């Protein structure tokens, strides 16, 4: 009997329960539509009870929401779950530095499989690119902020009440909160999902994704700077947060170290 594995599983389960109960507490304090609150509460309770399809729920009046969509594991899972609860519009932020033509087509195909409309919004990453090739900074934080702002601006333009991001690590009050007139919803962290659980949801909806770690801009950073410290720290943060297992974390680290 592998006692270490048993203990690890029990710790992971307890941590998941604590995070889900925390999401319930956050939900109760929010001033949102009663029907929506009850729907989200129901999905959280189903998740606490271990139901695989916890997100399958019917709601009469769906609030308008924008999903930040790349076609990756996190955003695709977020879109599948959000579609059950919200009137969803997916937005993909496009720049030649972070999205190839192949990635763009892949995002279109995944959105079609999920059954959501997708719009591409062009973003300006020239200054971020210059900083990356000149070795001034790691791209992820600045790039993520540009994308966030573009998605939120789009949501305001179409009068959406919610903006949904695929953040796995935004625990506690960061999972769902109001920012000015829009609710920001980090959906995977709200439901305490792991990367493996996300893949299972995708598979159950006929989607299997095999993707390399990082976007083209991150690979440019590694090529020009030969510095992997900050990327490895980001990977280890996901492992410590128990949203990615140790094997996948190790695989991702090896992959970036081999990027030339």
UniProtKB/Swiss-Prot annotation:
Annotated coiled-coil segments of the chain: none
Transmembrane segments: none
Superkingdom of origin: Archaea
SUPFAM superfamilies to which the protein is assigned, alphabetical: Adenine nucleotide alpha hydrolases-like
Any Pfam family the entry gives: DUF7411
InterPro entries: ATPase_PP-loop_MJ1638, DUF7411, Ni-pincer_cofactor_biosynth, Rossmann-like_a/b/a_fold
Listed name of the protein: Uncharacterized protein MJ1638
